[in-house]
Design a protein with these regions (language model features):
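Short beta-turn/strand-loop junction motif enriched in small, turn-promoting residues
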Residues: 185-189, 214-216, 257
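Internal maturation/activation junctions in enzymes
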Residues: 149-198, 203-206
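Internal helix-loop-helix
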Residues: 80-171, 218-220
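Glycine-rich beta->alpha junctions and the first turn(s) of the following alpha-helix
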Residues: 130, 251-257
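Buried hydrophobic positions in well-ordered alpha/beta secondary-structure cores of metabolic enzymes
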Residues: 141, 182, 200, 210-212, ...
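A short core secondary-structure module
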Residues: 207-252
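Short, solvent-exposed loop/turn segments at the edges of secondary structure
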Residues: 136, 177, 193-195, 220-222, ...
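Extended, charge-enriched "interface" segments that sit outside catalytic cores
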Residues: 1-110
């Protein structure tokens, strides 16, 4: 007895082993029109790699194996670490290798680099979307940090501008690559960040101690976060590293993912 009830038709086949760039006429035309045609060869290479069955499988694995919050180690020591499936790390390696997080901020950047970066972003987005969050925040934070990074963290600029992904828990200056997250929103302060209650107290050495909470603390495994807090003169933005300059963990507590 057959259990077949119908025949599947009028459905596209699996998207396997296609070039995500060369098959996108609109993207190729826009790239040239907006002044980034010089990146076409590299984008074709990226599109070929991302369109493979193996690459698309990485996206599936990263989404079906969500990150895990590890609050404590076996001895009861507080960690607040986030563990990811290996597929996540491989996807992040590709994004950083293709400089989706910092291409326009290079000293010798070319005209049209924002367009080229956007095209690379679009190709990666077709494989997996979650990894684009840390990449986008790092991209947005980099020009600010290039101008205003505290003196004791200036050595971070080299790994910040690298094409490497480094998931190790190390002081920023010792890493091959960095990620920057953001902590803006609070329970009572969503779009109205002026209502944030996190406070910043200036210490004798010129640094600040932040006390408060964040409703969203995006990419908690980042090497540092830009955090909004109320200082003496009003709302301001602070650079908060995951590890302090002496290598100790900062007092950041993650409640849930």
């Amino acid at each position: 007895m057959s259990w077949q009830t119908h025949t599947v038709f009028n459905q596209p086949g699996p998207l396997n082993n296609s070039n995500l760039f060369l098959s996108d006429g609109a993207l190729r035309e826009a790239l040239v029109r907006e002044g980034a045609g010089w990146d076409s060869d590299l984008l074709a290479s990226i599109g070929q790699q991302l369109g493979t069955a193996e690459s698309l499988e990485l996206g599936r694995l990263a989404n079906t194996n969500p990150p895990e919050l590890l609050r404590y180690d076996a001895t009861g020591t507080r960690l607040d670490d986030v563990r990811f499936h290996p597929a996540w790390h491989l996807l992040m390696q590709g994004l950083c290798a293709n400089r989706v997080h910092n291409l326009p901020w290079e000293e010798d950047t070319r005209a049209g680099s924002f367009v080229a970066r956007a095209a690379r972003f679009m190709l990666h987005a077709q494989v997996e979307a979650g990894t684009l969050c840390p990449i986008t925040m790092t991209f947005a934070a980099t020009p600010l940090l290039q101008q205003a990074l505290p003196a004791e963290f200036k050595e971070w600029l080299t790994p910040l501008m690298s094409d490497r992904y480094d998931s190790h828990l190390l002081p920023g200056a010792q890493k091959r690559g960095l990620l920057i997250g953001m902590g803006m929103t609070e329970k009572q302060g969503g779009s109205d960040v002026l209502s944030n209650t996190t406070r910043a107290e200036r210490l004798a050495d010129g640094s600040y101690r932040l006390v408060g909470h964040k409703w969203f603390f995006s990419v908690p495994q980042s090497d540092a976060h830009l955090v909004l807090a109320q200082a003496k003169g009003g709302l301001s933005c602070f650079f908060m590293p995951r590890l302090l300059p002496d290598g100790q963990r900062n007092a950041i507590r993650i409640e849930r993912l």
